[in-house]
């Protein structure tokens, strides 16, 4: 600021000097000393810049408030300039004082003021001198620093020289290495060339192998087509023989009619027109038969041509494929054996017919012969051919037209042919015997039914049908309306008796008044039975009549003793003392609230109270859930199976049974000291597997089975021990013991989308630096879960809200806001509904052998709240 003011003051003084100089020149000129040719300076002199400069000088001086700054500024003004300005101001002031009488200032006052200004200027000069000395010291320090930097610069230059020398040596080494690299590249090019040649040879060999495979497939297809053509040819020949026999029968019928006409011509002359019409009808039928015969002949010729073409193609294939020539010749000589070997692994229900065909076809009254083995096997394999629909349509059309596809071998003088005009149509093939054996005996397999599709229908049935169901099906279709409705043994046949039968069926006459000795003699020892608790219960024999009447009474009418016995069997024996005092009948428990149970029965344990409430609710709604069939002892074994044995004591103490598993909430698990998020998910997936398998106690597999054919529907039922066995089978036996107590089972592996191979590696304590081992585990894990579950896990990982599953994540209870404080008294601990695995309305849709889609379709694990378990404390 001071320097700017000094510069401005200096510029103003210089301008004032110039102005004063110009003024003097003007005064000289006004005195007449200038040349006559020069113009007056007043003509170009402008007083306004001087005024502006004086005003700027005043403003600059006003800005300098401190006297030291003003003194420093005055010390910088040149002496002549200051003297001139002083004189100029004194002259102007004297003129002003001379012209204005109002000014009272004297020269003494001005002198005193100037002396004060001088002192301030001296002070400013001393300050500036001190500043100059300080600047000199700084300059000396900077010179010392400069010398030090110069020394460092010299040292750096020396190091640079050394670095240049080392760099030149490195460059020489680099050149040597470049030459070696070039040599290695040449060698690499040679090796790559050899590798390409080897790959080319291998590719050609693979192409040859692929061509051989295609040729083998074509040969198999041609062999299959040849068998089909042969079967068609045989069937056509059989139809031709049948048609020829029908033609012969029609000829015999025509001859018989002609003889009858010749004998009765004289007696029945009035019916001549009717006979002509009958003859015309017979002629038309004969013509249709002849046309059908011609059609069959034409088809035989077409099939013969196709067979010849096939033989030519077979010869070409035999020429192109030398090693398969022997196989083709063997197949040509023995087509039945070759086709049976080709179909060794494809078993169809026709084999049941092959086993029971001889005794069923042994009736001498039935014309059609038994089908050969090759024919049945060929029919069983027609699913593999592209002409299956044609074959089916042909067989159905034949039967709809009334043509039997197999030749009838009955003699011409058979009474059956004498009674029926159309022997080819299905009808009453054998008369009924008096004892009804014909109606009960199964028909022959070789005989066509009313629709002509018995074998086709059998081919489409499942392999689980037994012989009885097949025989009933065939008998119902072949005998038409003759046989009665014989339904197989169904559950409808075991209906409960109604009315008085139901009442008499419940009464047992026995010597004992308490229990059935006959059933106890055959019964096995079981938990909770009479033989297992043979102490106090068998001694209660006083109220035998009341117990008899109580046996089938509803729960509301149970006596106090029976309710107490039920509580003992239920695992809540510690509350029997209070129950004897409070419970008067079963109706007391049915109408009791959880608060009443806590107050009157002393049930302080929330899960005991929940167990009793659920049991009473199930009895009140009259529904018997499968989850109530097993007790808390089974639940402890189930915890072993899912890999969480560390919680057995808590679950056993809380008496958690299968019904409670359905209604377990997040708060219940937290009360059971299950705080790990991974363990919550493990229990959730395990309960879901129980839901899908209808709470089958043996749904979890503990022992390894066939390792080659593993599907996700089987893996989802693996126990923790089975997963450890799988780890041993994939060469990770040393890490398998780490899964004990981890909660990893098949349901968690398949159903939890966030459980990946990395999660399993983390649970197995495989170090992250062992990348090959982790990659091996991930590969085996993806092959185990299948492509569907793998794709679902990848989509879950790709979602923006994905958080990886860790072993340290904890589940915290839900934090209630201010709006929930009013509901704290209304909803207690055991009344929450945030179930760990909510029950679906379609729990019973999927069986234990349901595929993986059934598990996923019922799975409640896709909720987005899963990702925030460790924050809100709920799973579903």
From Swiss-Prot:
Q: Which GO terms describe its biological process?
A: neuromuscular junction development
Keyword Kinase found: no
Gene Ontology, cellular component aspect: cytosol; extracellular space; presynaptic active zone
- Taxonomically, the superkingdom here is Eukaryota
Q: Does the keyword Phosphoprotein apply?
A: yes
Q: Which CDD domains match?
A: SAM_liprin-beta1_2_repeat1, SAM_liprin-beta1_2_repeat2, SAM_liprin-beta1_2_repeat3
Sorted alphabetically, which keywords does the UniProt record give? Coiled coil, Phosphoprotein, Repeat
Q: Which PROSITE patterns match?
A: SAM_DOMAIN (PS50105)
* Database matches in SMART domains: SAM
Q: In which tissues is it expressed?
A: Widely expressed.
Residue span, SAM domain: 558-622, 630-693, 718-783
Q: Which residues form a coiled coil?
A: 101-313
Q: What segment(s) does the record annotate as region Disordered?
A: 356-376, 425-451, 470-500, 527-553
What is said about the domains? Answer: The N-terminal coiled coil regions mediate homodimerization preferentially and heterodimerization type beta/beta. The C-terminal, non-coiled coil regions mediate heterodimerization type beta/alpha.
Give the family from UniProt.
Belongs to the liprin family. Liprin-beta subfamily.
Q: What is this protein called?
A: Liprin-beta-2
